[in-house]
Amino acid sequence: MIYDVIVIGAGPAGGMTARILSKKGYSVLIIDKKKKVGCPIQCGEVISEFGLMNSKLKPRKEWIKRKHKGIKIFVPDDNFFFSFTKSYSINREKFDQWLIKEAVDYGGRLLLKTNASGIRKKKIWYVKTNRGVFKSDILVGADGPEANVAVWLNLLRKKEFVGAIQYKFKSIDFPEKEFLCMFLNAKFKNGYAWIFPRGDEFNVGVGGIGNIKKWLDDFCKSKGFDLNKKISVNAGIIPKNYILKNFVKQSALIVGDAAGLTNPIFKGGIYAALFSGKLAGETICKAFEFNDFSLLKEYADKLRNSPFCNPILKKASEIFYSFKNEELNFTGYVYSQNNWKKVSYFEIFLKFLSKPKFFLKLRDLWTVKNGIELSEKTI
């Protein structure tokens, strides 16, 4: 059998792509090397309300854990400021499974424990796996940070990532229940620590480049959390700087983490996965409708023009994560216990006047402010 589309990867990006295509009646094969969709969990399990709404998905009780008012961002001296980006903590395992079930219910086929080991293109795509060779007209690489499909297509020029590790606690004594909490410190190179309240449980984690396991253990101890009471551990990698020659080659498309679309400031990737998966699915439908696969390049064009590929994000991230603790504390002083959006440029300027040694960082803080604003539409 020759499928219309083979999707490699059953995460949010692959699930969304497959859901759209199978709903339109196209034959879709989804393959994933995992034994179970959504396992193991490799993220903080958060998506913004905007991201979910813009993906045309309604919150469902089966995978929503808690709604949050926003993000409370702590600097090393314990000062903090807010980003009032409403968001949801989700059960990522159930969310991924729901998306894939939707695709299968519409007619898609799912094969788990199926590891793609290579691809070949003649008139159609041949995907080599441990369960045989599968064929399709169009191929979608939704294989996460490993990005094997992009590598096989010779599209991936650069691949840098950060590590992340997270403990789940059934219940911890932590006063903040309404906000996601993000803890900045220069020792978390290219990352941060987090505490995400989820109703009857909490996710506590650290991401960055370095000894993240030690950082997380030390962080938990500093907050008084009993490590013996953690109920699960998950870890993974998060794209930091993936540079692709293109997001499309011939009749193959790269989506989600495999395309390096993760937000470089907050490290969130679920909305980026859904956005790119939705865009890929819609573009593929159009290509089939007009019997013109050259239209697939529209996916790359639209993705490049989306907020996810805006160079401000990368620039702001590089500046943000180059700050020393003194500069992070000054950032906390500038926005002190306020919604960062409501602090005017004049107020920021006055803060700089009060501490003139930071004047050389004025432009940097402006860039970070712009990056955070853009991030609120990409997480």
Each model region followed by its residue ranges:
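FAD/FMN-dependent oxidoreductases across multiple families
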Residues: 116-118, 133, 210-284, 298
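N-terminal FAD cofactor-binding segment of flavoenzymes
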Residues: 37-72
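N-terminal Rossmann-fold NAD(P) dinucleotide-binding loop
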Residues: 14-15
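C-terminal helical "tail/cap" subdomain of flavin- and related membrane-associated enzymes
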Residues: 285-379
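Beta1/beta-strand and adjacent pyrophosphate-binding region of the FAD-binding site
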Residues: 1-11
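Predominantly flavin-linked oxidoreductase catalytic cores and closely associated redox partners
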Residues: 102-229, 260
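Short beta-strand to alpha-helix junction loop
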Residues: 82-102, 208-215
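Glycine-rich FAD pyrophosphate-binding loop
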Residues: 6, 22-41
